């Protein structure tokens, strides 16, 4: 996932083997990260198929209702694995393509069995069948969000339809999920930071694995990396226009002393707010802020963004949501991943799907069908917590709406579940970048290839496996 984020330019090159190949969109067939991911998803499929063999045996004390529910959750996990494999390694956007993935439905993945790739249509058929079973038989109201529910299965199928460019069905299912969410125990968090503090316990989480201190946790390497050029540019451009205070001018402190930041809502000395401005301790002159011609200019916000820390560029003027997505509150790295263990290590879960993503799916799907009023209502709901009002959303022109939906989704959801890459590829294929500025477009990937290569080791172990056309000569 780190490599995919590098490829999407939502994260700088990760400190993992071969990540530079992702950033350059020039991935070798022997890339170790690609091989690890490919193998890992088939390990999930193998585990599911093994479980399905044994769960159908006579197990004392197991009711048929519980057996069916467990089968449904297992099949939902298999659907998630196959959908991810197809989107990473198959021509998922072409319904008539022969380049799906190798399917193991009722048998185990072992012994290097030669296996042809199934077509894209055949792969989608298996995914759809598994999800339909999960929608019908998974728990409706799970006590824990680390279990797959019927609502999650339906949300995952909406995502599947977006991959197929089937916007009508994507919108229909996504809006069903939204209408059913509250009764099933899901909801948007009003505080964005709470999502990543509560992790799999957040009401917004449709599915995230159980990871808990002290013995079961997942290292949060995201925090160690930095947002990519595309994410930073989009976040910069989404900072609302200043309407209240103008630019904030910090007087040059000269040699030492405190730096006094005038309150942008009041007079230059901060008297309107009664607090005398915002003070950044200067001590013996150790706080160095370039003064230029006598003052330091920081782009203005609404007067409520301080205190901030020197050196964080213009992070102080971000809305709360995009502050966390972009840089964090005076943090380096991807600040939403800030969960600490008692041993002071960063640890987190893996956020496979949040309810917010369902709103973005529905909003984009409606906009692509020309249903702009519906799209605006959906977008306004999910970005309200970032400080955007219904009036802000209504001011977006129809021709700009698709582009704005993606910008907000990038800031909200990048560096979580690979989806930003697939979103960018869809916009490149189907349109939506037209309203972006030239500076924003300059930060987009080149889209040389939409897919990853089938790993060289897998090709060598399976005589019937065919490489993706873009990588045949590598």
Predicted regions and their residues:
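Short coil/linker segments at helix-helix boundaries
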Residues: 65, 88-125
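Conserved, well-structured interaction surfaces
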Residues: 14-89, 118, 136-141, 345-350, ...
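Hydrophobic-face positions in mid-chain alpha helices that act as interaction patches
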Residues: 171-258, 262-269, 274-286, 291-355, ...
């Amino acid at each position: 996932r780190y490599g995919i984020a590098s490829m999407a330019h939502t994260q700088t090159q990760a400190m993992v083997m071969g990540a530079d190949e992702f950033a350059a969109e020039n991935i070798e067939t022997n890339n170790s990260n690609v091989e690890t991911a490919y193998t890992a998803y088939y390990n999930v499929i193998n585990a599911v198929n093994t479980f399905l063999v044994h769960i159908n045996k006579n197990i004392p004390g197991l009711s048929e209702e519980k057996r069916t529910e467990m089968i449904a959750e297992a099949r939902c996990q298999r659907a998630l694995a196959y959908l991810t494999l197809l989107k990473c390694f198959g021509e998922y956007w072409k319904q008539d393509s022969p380049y799906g993935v190798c399917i193991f439905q009722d048998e185990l993945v072992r012994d290097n069995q030669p296996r042809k790739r199934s077509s894209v249509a055949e792969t989608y058929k298996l995914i759809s069948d598994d999800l339909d079973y999960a929608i019908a038989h998974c728990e409706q109201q799970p006590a824990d969000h680390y279990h797959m529910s019927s609502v999650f299965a339906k949300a995952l199928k909406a995502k599947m339809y977006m991959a197929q460019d089937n916007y009508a069905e994507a919108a229909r299912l996504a809006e069903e999920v939204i209408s059913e969410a509250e009764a099933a125990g899901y909801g948007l968090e009003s505080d964005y930071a709470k999502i990543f503090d509560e992790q799999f316990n957040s009401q917004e989480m449709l599915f995230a694995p159980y990871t808990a201190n002290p013995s079961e946790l997942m290292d949060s390497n995201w925090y160690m990396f930095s947002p990519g050029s595309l994410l930073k540019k989009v976040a910069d451009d989404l900072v609302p226009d200043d309407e209240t205070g103008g630019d904030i001018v910090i007087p040059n402190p000269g040699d030492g002393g405190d730096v006094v930041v005038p309150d942008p809502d009041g007079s230059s000395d901060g008297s309107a707010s009664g607090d005398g401005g915002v003070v950044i301790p200067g001590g013996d002159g150790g706080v160095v802020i370039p003064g230029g011609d006598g003052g330091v200019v920081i782009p203005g916000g609404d007067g409520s963004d301080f205190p901030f820390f020197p050196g964080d560029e213009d992070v102080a003027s971000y809305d709360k949501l995009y502050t966390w997505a972009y840089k964090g509150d005076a943090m380096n790295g991807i600040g939403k991943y800030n969960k600490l263990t008692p041993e002071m290590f960063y640890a987190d879960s893996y956020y496979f799907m949040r309810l917010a993503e369902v709103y973005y799916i529905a909003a984009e799907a409606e906009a692509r069908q020309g249903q702009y009023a519906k799209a605006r209502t959906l977008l306004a709901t999910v970005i309200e917590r970032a400080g955007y009002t219904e009036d802000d959303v209504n001011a977006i022109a129809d021709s700009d709406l698709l582009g704005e939906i993606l910008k907000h989704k990038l800031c909200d959801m990048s560096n979580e579940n690979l989806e930003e890459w697939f979103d960018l590829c869809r916009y490149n294929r189907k349109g939506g970048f037209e309203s972006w500025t030239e500076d924003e477009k300059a930060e987009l990937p080149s889209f040389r290839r939409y897919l990853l290569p089938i790993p060289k080791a897998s090709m060598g172990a399976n005589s019937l496996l065919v490489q993706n056309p873009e990588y045949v000569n590598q």
